[in-house]
From Swiss-Prot:
Part of the 50S ribosomal subunit. GO terms for cellular component: ribonucleoprotein complex; ribosome. It comes from Limosilactobacillus fermentum (strain NBRC 3956 / LMG 18251). Belongs to the bacterial ribosomal protein bL31 family. Type B subfamily. Pfam families: Ribosomal_L31. This is Large ribosomal subunit protein bL31B.
Length: 81
């Protein structure tokens, strides 16, 4: 691997802004904020808006909407059932 061209890969704590859930993962993301993790070490803190803890797909609160298709629109427009 060529030296000096790859981003710095390190452990980072991600915090879900909506729920406050925190998890640690390897990343190239950086931040000036730091937080002390459960192991006693200090890691950069990256705040994110959506994680698996708050996304509707993962929480089971996903809602599906019924979109009218072209045939339904035609039938509605011309009064067919």
């Amino acid at each position: 691997m060529k030296q000096g061209i790859h981003p710095d890969y390190h452990l980072v704590v991600f915090e879900d802004s909506a729920t406050g859930y925190k998890f640690i993962s390897g990343s190239t993301a950086t931040s000036k904020e730091t937080v002390e993790w459960e192991d006693g070490n200090e890691y950069p803190l990256v705040r994110v808006e959506v994680t698996s803890d708050s996304h509707p797909f993962y929480t089971g609160k996903q809602k599906f909407t019924q979109a009218d298709g072209a045939v339904d629109k035609f039938n509605k427009k011309y009064g067919f059932k």
